[in-house]
UniProtKB/Swiss-Prot annotation:
It catalyses: N(6)-carboxybiotinyl-L-lysyl-[protein] + acetyl-CoA = N(6)-biotinyl-L-lysyl-[protein] + malonyl-CoA. It is found in: Plastid, Chloroplast stroma. PROSITE patterns: COA_CT_NTER. Gene3D superfamilies: 2-enoyl-CoA Hydratase, Chain A, domain 1. The lineage of its organism: Eukaryota, Viridiplantae, Streptophyta, Embryophyta, Tracheophyta. Keywords: ATP-binding, Chloroplast, Fatty acid biosynthesis, Fatty acid metabolism, Lipid biosynthesis, Lipid metabolism, Metal-binding, Nucleotide-binding, Plastid, Transferase, Zinc, Zinc-finger. This is Acetyl-coenzyme A carboxylase carboxyl transferase subunit beta, chloroplastic. It is an enzyme of class 2 (transferase).
Length: 484
């Protein structure tokens, strides 16, 4: 029987780990003198000693002691000596082949906890849909399974004896990584001296006290965003919600688009107090229309699915309307139609260039024919703006732009610009396939396909959009108020 030392200190004050892990991950030595030689411990490490973070689902930036595929090389007959905060040492012995697990009598409650865990329905009756943090996709592999449950047992035992603030890991994508490993290993894989982390036991019924570093992370986590295509993290204020790893364009709120396009301090919103009054008393078994409106208003901070107003773009006065897909899918109801109509009429009277940023699923079904009439109403005032006054209208199509918006003002711009990879269509792919019983080719409703067919004038990346708009306005004799 070969024995290994693993010094892990849990105190009421600081969480300490006394050991260092080299960059090559080939040595691990205890800080105190023990009866086991350092060479023996290195020998055990060379046999792929497995760390606490075995079930991490997001370990691309974390160097584990051994990867999941090497778990089969785990020592099948091994004893670990563990010391707690009270300087009490006890042994953990297990045999993977025989599924045998034994704890020193000084900590017999851990042994009872393990056997209760293994005898429960978790071992044999779990499925992937149970949302179980300990679900093992290799449940049929005995060695892998047994090792998983040994680690789960030890992990769960310490969880039950240490109070953790649930908000501490709420914003982390690694929340299902082993709890102990999260607090010991940093992203570089080295053991870190966690002088700022304070843990109190259940005796005082207190929560985890996080460090100042984590307070800062909580305060500024809105500055970071995760790509829904490759799951990479990016600083969204710099990258404009465009993934720097895969180039995927993420959705932007209307406020973010206004901030991107309009000069700071020049935005003047219009008709902010206009709200829908449920004109046809729409009845829904799932959720009343007014409740959905209230919920969307609380979520987005907007009164409806569009923001309208005036501002300056590189010093050039413009009228701007920006739709927000987060508000009921950017659907166009009577309020959206009225706000856009008033914006166009104001731009007509003031002889301002007009920009409408479209992001919508189409007409709002909860308002029936009133929502459909907004298509004709907006198109009518646009006709006067473009034909009678000879003013300049730019339509910007973002993903997704579909339905009634595409069939009306979305495609009426003097210049029609789309974002890269934007989904633009009148009827969605699913609707077409169900109606015509024909498959819709992939990419046929993407901006690049529409550009090749002549339905768009240009596809402009976000970082170049403001400069392109400035040049278009100057080409049509719209210049900054103050030339510097």
């Amino acid at each position: 029987m070969e024995k290994s030392w693993f010094n892990l200190m849990f105190s009421k004050g600081e969480l300490e780990s006394r050991g260092e892990l080299s960059k090559a991950m080939d040595s691990f030595a205890p800080s105190e003198k023990t009866t086991i030689s350092q060479d023996r411990f290195i020998y055990d490490m060379d046999k792929n000693f497995y760390g606490w973070g075995e079930r991490s689902s997001y370990s691309n930036n974390v160097d584990l002691l051994v990867s999941s595929k090497d778990i089969r090389n785990f020592i099948s007959d091994d004893t670990f000596f563990v010391r707690d905060s009270n300087k009490n040492s006890y042994s953990i012995y297990f045999d993977i082949k025989k599924k045998f697990f034994e704890i020193d009598n000084d900590f017999s409650d851990l042994e009872i906890f393990f056997y209760n865990y293994c005898s429960s329905s978790y071992l044999n009756n779990r499925s992937k849909g149970d949302n179980d943090l300990h679900y093992d996709p290799y449940i049929k592999d005995t060695k892998y399974n047994c090792t998983n449950h040994i680690n789960s047992c030890i992990d769960s035992y310490f969880r039950s004896h240490i109070c953790i603030d649930s908000n501490f890991l709420s914003n982390s994508k690694n929340s299902n990584e082993s709890y102990i490993y999260n607090f010991i290993c940093s992203e570089s894989g080295k053991i870190r001296e966690s002088k700022n982390y304070k843990i109190r036991t259940n005796r005082n019924r207190s929560n985890l006290i996080s460090s100042k570093d984590f307070d800062i992370t909580q305060n500024y986590n809105q500055l970071w965003i995760q790509c829904d295509n490759c799951y990479g993290l990016m600083y969204k204020k710099v990258k404009m919600n465009v993934c720097e790893q895969c180039g995927h364009y993420l959705k932007m709120s209307s406020s973010e688009r206004i901030e991107l396009s309009i000069d700071p301090g020049t935005w003047n919103p219009m008709d902010e107090d206009m709200v829908s009054a449920d004109p046809i008393k729409f009845h829904s078994k799932e959720e009343p229309y007014k409740n959905r409106i209230d919920s969307a208003q609380k979520t987005t901070g907007l009164t409806d699915a569009v923001q309208t107003g005036t501002g300056q773009l590189n010093g050039i006065p413009v009228a701007l309307g920006v739709m927000d897909f987060q508000f009921m899918g950017g659907s166009m109801g009577s309020v959206v139609g009225e706000k856009i109509t008033r914006l166009i009429e104001y731009a007509t009277n003031q002889c301002l260039p007009l920009i409408l940023v479209c992001s919508s699923g189409g007409a709002r079904m909860q308002e029936g024919s009133l929502s459909l009439m907004q298509m004709a109403k907006i198109s009518s005032v646009l006709c006067d703006y473009q034909s009678s006054k000879k003013l300049f209208y730019i339509s910007i199509l973002t993903s997704p732009t579909t339905g009634g918006v595409t069939a009306s003002f979305g495609m009426l711009g003097d210049i029609i610009i789309a974002e890269p990879y934007a989904y633009i269509a009148f009827a969605g792919k699913r609707v077409i396939e169900q109606t015509l019983k024909k498959a819709v080719p992939d990419g046929s409703q993407a901006a690049e396909s529409l550009l090749r067919k002549g339905l768009l004038d240009a596809i402009v990346p976000r970082n170049l959009l403001k400069g392109v708009l400035r040049e278009l306005f100057q080409l049509h004799a719209f210049f900054p108020l103050n030339k510097n």
